[in-house]
Amino acid sequence: MASYLYGVLFAVGLCAPIYCVSPANAPSAYPRPSSTKSTPASQVYSLNTDFAFRLYRRLVLETPSQNIFFSPVSVSTSLAMLSLGAHSVTKTQILQGLGFNLTHTPESAIHQGFQHLVHSLTVPSKDLTLKMGSALFVKKELQLQANFLGNVKRLYEAEVFSTDFSNPSIAQARINSHVKKKTQGKVVDIIQGLDLLTAMVLVNHIFFKAKWEKPFHPEYTRKNFPFLVGEQVTVHVPMMHQKEQFAFGVDTELNCFVLQMDYKGDAVAFFVLPSKGKMRQLEQALSARTLRKWSHSLQKRWIEVFIPRFSISASYNLETILPKMGIQNVFDKNADFSGIAKRDSLQVSKATHKAVLDVSEEGTEATAATTTKFIVRSKDGPSYFTVSFNRTFLMMITNKATDGILFLGKVENPTKS
């Protein structure tokens, strides 16, 4: 009997803006915990943050001097779900690549933590929209293992669709239509080039819309404000402007300003501006511990802030990036996904991640013991401190319930969408 190698395509679609929208009508059967200390969930949240920064550093190497934007929680959730059907080295590489020590952390605890994460990110809120979901488009002739099918539905709330891949263009259109609908039209054509060997497509999407707790007033936006790209090039951008009380601090160890701006609801944005020439130092130091330090150390003060109004998008072929982070076996002929389908040889042929971010006056739309000292200016000084994000800066959007990074990016040039 002939042996065929079929492709599993893993795609991640996401989008992030901030507007006033109706809340989702999802059930709230899984309340958010008041504390996540010493639980599988807390470990997943912390390791997801470290994974986010490791993936960020890899993307910086792969795409130098370019805008970066992605959803680490979307990527890690997709990989964890894929590991449910992996065996031997394939499973080990996925879970260790996500940062788990399999000697100390049982696999069941890992999936329990992700289950809690998925539930936490689907609890409806009247103040913001945050929707994350997964879908499997499976070749209709492929017989999925009952255990895998049950676990992806139970633990990851994934939808499963029987799909006719004998007509790749029709299958592709169906999958792209699903992602477009789930991201409210922001992520389009994420799937390209399906072929007759495609057996399964795994899609994860995340969509975020929220208003600033303290919005900018459009009449104060400056139309042509200079923004330094690199060391010599200047572009002109619409620069939002306001004077308000925000959580703010100066990280003297990492030579950067850190500004926290809250959204209405359960989300927070961090804007991080390193001193000139200190971006690389900052990037190398990013970790879950760094983010916790900022979250706990910033203090409210009057700030005059200038932030560009911008829209950026990014697309990544993760099959070329993840192997450099130790997740290699997934993409070659040695992959063992016998937990997905017993009789067919499967490997991941392509892993696509696409993200879109809009930041405006109203808000954002996006489709995850230390000795460092923070400085808060003396009340005897100026009445407010001015910080202008008029050169390369980092932005991350976090979820208060999980302390997880939903979106992470670097704005090199806000005029490039």
From Swiss-Prot:
Molecular function GO labels: serine-type endopeptidase inhibitor activity
Tissues in which the UniProt entry reports expression: Highly expressed in normal germinal center (GC) B-cells and GC B-cell-derived malignancies.
Stretch forming the signal peptide: 1-23
Entries under SMART domains matching the protein: SERPIN
Annotated InterPro entries: Serpin_CS (IPR023795), Serpin_dom (IPR023796), Serpin_fam (IPR000215), Serpin_sf (IPR036186), Serpin_sf_1 (IPR042178), Serpin_sf_2 (IPR042185)
Glycosylation sites recorded in the entry for this protein: N101, N390
Domain of life the protein comes from: Eukaryota
Database matches in PROSITE patterns: SERPIN (PS00284)
A cellular-component GO term for this protein: cytoplasm
Functional summary from the UniProt entry: Protease inhibitor that inhibits trypsin and trypsin-like serine proteases (in vitro). Inhibits plasmin and thrombin with lower efficiency (in vitro).
Similarity section: Belongs to the serpin family.
The protein, known as: Serpin A9
